[in-house]
């Protein structure tokens, strides 16, 4: 193994010494492929690795800025969602994608159980262990998960929202935030759009609503 593989960590953290009820997470922060995953290459051209299928463009920068604004800790993944998706439960069939938005992921097509478990142990589980550790430091922790979404999936209608606030049923902060952001002349806000804020086993379900 090269030095990168030996020193690799599955997450970035910032401000972990801050005592804040806020915790900022970024599940899809990077398009990085660790060298122990198919030699650091999933078989996709560079232009596909820059698409939303590989990560959430811009999300990490927003997470860092929000962490600074709130004086809150930030934890972000250090692996592409195509390696293994940290925003999926371990039993979710989309945990390791073979086809995403019309693009075949060559290195994932024949990944066996041993490969899946290796990616879980090297990437997915260490990231979630860190989120869980930071979330458990206070009883009143509020997790804000930062994502970005593509304006249009292939073969689908355009998404008109400039920002989406996603949340599970019964959550109280998000509706007030939506009202503020959607004030006249402000933003086009998706209320649990472009997708629902509750997916069983996802990162928020695991750490924020358990």
Predicted feature locations:
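N-terminal catalytic or cofactor-binding beta/alpha core of small enzyme domains
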Residues: 2-143, 148-210
């Amino acid at each position: 193994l090269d030095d990168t593989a030996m020193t690799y960590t599955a997450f970035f953290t910032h401000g972990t010494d801050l005592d804040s009820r806020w915790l900022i997470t970024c599940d899809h922060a990077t398009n990085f492929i660790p060298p122990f995953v198919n030699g650091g290459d999933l078989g996709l051209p560079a232009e596909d690795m820059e698409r939303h299928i590989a990560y959430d463009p811009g999300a990490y920068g927003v997470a860092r800025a929000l962490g600074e604004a709130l004086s809150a800790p930030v934890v972000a993944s250090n692996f592409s969602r195509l390696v293994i998706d940290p925003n999926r439960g371990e039993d979710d069939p989309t945990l390791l994608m073979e086809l995403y938005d019309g693009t075949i992921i060559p290195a994932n097509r024949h990944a066996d159980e041993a490969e899946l478990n290796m990616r879980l142990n090297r990437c997915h589980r260490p990231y979630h262990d860190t989120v869980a550790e930071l979330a458990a430091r206070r009883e009143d922790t509020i997790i804000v998960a930062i994502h970005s979404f593509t304006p249009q999936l292939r073969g689908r209608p355009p998404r008109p929202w400039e920002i989406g606030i996603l949340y599970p049923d019964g959550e109280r902060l998000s509706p007030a935030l939506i009202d503020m952001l959607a004030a006249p002349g402000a933003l086009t806000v998706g209320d649990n759009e472009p997708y629902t804020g509750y997916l069983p086993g996802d990162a928020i379900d695991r750490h924020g609503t358990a």
